[in-house]
A protein has these predicted regions:
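Polybasic "coupling" helices that flank or enter modular domains
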Residues: 98-166
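Short loop/turn motifs at secondary-structure junctions and domain boundaries
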Residues: 2, 19-22, 146
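Cyclic nucleotide-binding regulatory domains
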Residues: 16-78
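Short proline/glycine- and basic residue-enriched helix-capping loop/turn segments at helix->loop/beta transitions
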Residues: 1-14, 68
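Phosphate-/nucleic-acid-contacting segments
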Residues: 140-220
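Residues that recognize and position ribonucleotide moieties
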Residues: 10, 17, 29, 51, ...
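Cyclic-nucleotide recognition modules
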Residues: 51-116
Length: 220
């Protein structure tokens, strides 16, 4: 159904703005290919990344009901994005209870990820935080068929990781070197392989329950 109501598909270049901060949207954007990030900027220009988006993610489903976007979305890599008009989402919520619950679940999982990120930012040290994130990205990418043998392409720079975790690029680089040196991961370019899943999970105190990957929605 969602595929049928997409009004247009747009390809964005890496670092191109997809949804401007403070904008009013008439559609919600669904990632078909590539990586994107949700972010907010401070007056001095500093950026806080509040979410990373992978294929299959709605990046701004909340714009369906919120009149103004307090955050923005930018492409981290070349991205293919489908626009789903809010007028069509309105029709879905009126006439298709099952799909309405699917959309609602999407926003609930998005909120669960945000709550977990708040916990990691507030209560974990930097190494635990990065380990937790590497586990999360593995499971999210595995769910859409983009992993192989505990390996995946992480198309996110160390600067972008720093903007998500409140760390300098130097600190992110040092943590990744430590994880490699301890045999937990292997990384080359944008490729990440998790060599010891159990140890990395323990390092990041990672429990995937908040992703609700096996959540089922009952049909009417």
């Amino acid at each position: 159904m969602i595929q049928q109501i997409t009004s247009r598909v747009t390809t964005y270049k890496a670092h191109e703005e997809v949804v401007p901060e403070g904008s009013t949207q008439s559609h919600s954007s669904l990632v078909l290919k590539g990586f994107a990030a949700r972010h907010q900027h401070l007056a001095g220009g500093k950026r806080q990344i509040t979410a990373f988006h992978v294929p299959g993610d709605f990046m701004d489903l909340h714009s369906f009901l919120l009149k103004k976007m307090e955050d923005g979305v930018g492409a981290l890599t070349p991205c293919t994005v489908a626009a789903v008009p809010h007028s069509d989402l309105r029709e879905i919520t009126k006439n298709y209870p099952y799909l309405t619950r699917v959309l609602w679940l999407t926003t609930l999982i998005d909120a669960a990820v945000h709550r977990t990120w708040i916990m990691t930012l507030g209560r974990m040290d930097a190494r635990n935080r990065v380990a937790h994130f590497l586990c999360e990205m593995h499971d999210r990418l595995e769910a859409v068929g983009l992993t192989k043998d505990h390996g995946y392409d992480l198309r996110i720079t160390q600067e972008e990781l720093g903007d998500a975790f409140g760390l300098t690029t130097v600190h992110v680089n040092r943590i990744l070197q430590e994880l490699r040196g301890d045999g937990l991961i292997t990384s080359r370019g944008k490729s990440v392989v998790i060599n010891d899943w159990e140890r990395l999970q323990k390092e990041g105190q990672y429990n995937p329950d908040y992703l609700h990957l096996s959540q089922q929605i009952e049909r009417d």
